[in-house]
From Swiss-Prot:
SUPFAM superfamilies: Glutamyl tRNA-reductase catalytic, N-terminal domain, Glutamyl tRNA-reductase dimerization domain, NAD(P)-binding Rossmann-fold domains. Catalyzes the NADPH-dependent reduction of glutamyl-tRNA(Glu) to glutamate 1-semialdehyde (GSA). The active site is at C50 (nucleophile). This is Glutamyl-tRNA reductase. Belongs to the glutamyl-tRNA reductase family. During catalysis, the active site Cys acts as a nucleophile attacking the alpha-carbonyl group of tRNA-bound glutamate with the formation of a thioester intermediate between enzyme and glutamate, and the concomitant release of tRNA(Glu). The thioester intermediate is finally reduced by direct hydride transfer from NADPH, to form the product GSA. GO terms for biological process: protoporphyrinogen IX biosynthetic process from glutamate. Homodimer.
Length: 415
């Protein structure tokens, strides 16, 4: 089995392709179990965010077979995924996972949310019972590296995230947010960050819409906002100058018709909308309306690029930490190989012991002399344990394999 990281991200695939293979939280456990039951992977975890879908697994299968599984499971185009995917094996897979968890492979360099998403990916796989020793150890090494990157570099300073970029873009369109109302759809971590950034910029009013009023109230309370249900959005939409949405819905929440009605009530006063969700919460056709500025996560890239430079020096140090992490991972894997070898050796020797002891017990019950039995048992065990190594040594000697002979001496402490 070998560690594999296979997936697509914002660098390799458009939003249209990414949303086709995005997994909602409710889908993940079913997908994890389905993949393991397919026989393609012994251990598996799936990371699915707005910017990437990645499969991490211990597998003996070809990457192409897992790519076909992903396409079939999500009813996506295998040809599209073929052009957009990447596959990393072994040490390269570990390096990739470390870079992802540290924020070095994110749309926003150094963004902190990805580590939490990676930990959630690990937790879901653990709860689903599809993690084994190999993938567990890989994740632990990944988390240790990401923690070092956060604590030993400035990669997380000067907050830059999709949420920050969305608010920065809003400021470019509405220079003063103190007179504006923002409608936030969702109540997750990204929306919480958006709310915090908007509050820091002095937004006049915040409205939080969510599928459950309880979650909306929890966020609204923290930011002195108004909490509403998703069903109430049409009523409140005309009051919103800014709409930012990030939910896990599999279907759009805002259509062109609903926005047209809101614009009429606003007397066509412009609306700024950012759809951070994958799949999208806002129908793309909404962007065709003359008085709407609609942006997606891909549109935020330009804003984000301007803020990358301050983190690039820190990223160099982070890559050095990742190099060290990969070396430690290699040592972990070698140690794990030794553990498996010792386990197999012990099972083999215990099987021989059990067989010989059973023979001795049978002879004892038949009235054999105990002292003679002990001598016979010890002789048989010695011969059985010596047979395979002795045969291998004779063969190595006849073939001139001196290094194996020297290794044998070292292994058994023979001078």
């Amino acid at each position: 089995m070998t560690l594999l990281a296979l997936g697509i991200n914002h660098n390799t695939a458009t939003l249209d392709v990414r949303e086709k293979v995005a997994f909602s939280p409710a889908e993940l456990e079913v997908a994890l179990c389905a993949l393991r039951e397919s026989g393609l992977a012994e251990e598996v975890a799936i990371l699915s965010t707005c910017n990437r879908t990645e499969i991490y697994c211990e597998t003996g299968a070809e990457a192409q077979h897992l790519l076909v599984w992903l396409a079939e499971h999500k009813a996506a185009s295998a040809q599209e995924l073929q052009h957009a995917h990447y596959a990393r094996w072994g040490d390269d897979a570990a390096r990739h996972m470390m870079a992802v968890a540290s924020g070095l492979d994110s749309l926003v360099l150094g963004e902190p949310q990805i580590l939490g998403q990676m930990k959630s990916c690990y937790a879901v796989a653990r709860e689903a019972g599809v993690l084994g020793r190999g993938l567990h150890d890989a994740f632990q090494r990944v988390f240790a590296v990401a923690k070092r990157v956060r604590s030993e570099t400035a990669i997380g300073e000067n907050p830059v995230s999709v949420a920050y970029a969305a608010v920065s873009l809003a400021q470019q369109i509405f220079s003063d947010l103190k007179q504006d109302t923002a409608l936030l759809i969702g109540a997750g971590e990204t929306i919480e960050l958006v709310a915090r950034h908007l509050k820091n910029q002095g937004i006049k009013k915040l409205i939080v819409a969510n599928r459950t009023l309880e979650n909306a109230h929890a966020l609204a309370k923290e930011f002195a906002a108004e909490a509403i249900l998703l069903a109430d959005i049409p009523e409140y939409l005309p009051t919103a100058d800014i709409v930012i949405s990030s939910t896990a819905s599999q279907l759009p929440l805002l259509g062109k018709g609903a926005v047209e009605v809101a614009l009429k009530k606003r007397k066509h006063k412009p609306m700024f909308m950012v759809d951070i969700a994958v799949p999208r919460d806002i129908e793309p056709q909404v962007g065709d309306l003359a008085d709407v500025y609609l942006f997606t996560v891909d549109d935020l890239k330009e804003v984000i690029d301007e803020n990358k430079k301050s983190r690039e020096e820190a990223a160099k140090t982070a890559r050095t930490i990742i190099d060290e992490g990969v070396e430690r991972y290699q040592l972990d894997q070698r140690a794990l190989s030794a553990v498996e070898l010792v386990k197999d050796f012990r099972q083999q020797t215990e099987a021989v012991r059990d067989q010989e002891v059973q023979k001795a017990l049978n002879a004892l019950r038949s009235g054999a002399d105990p002292e003679e039995l002990l001598l016979t048992l010890s002789r048989n065990l010695t011969n059985k344990f010596m047979h395979q190594p002795t045969t291998a040594l004779k063969r190595a000697s006849s073939e001139g394999r001196e290094q194996l002979l020297q290794d044998f001496k070292s292994l058994f402490g023979l001078d």
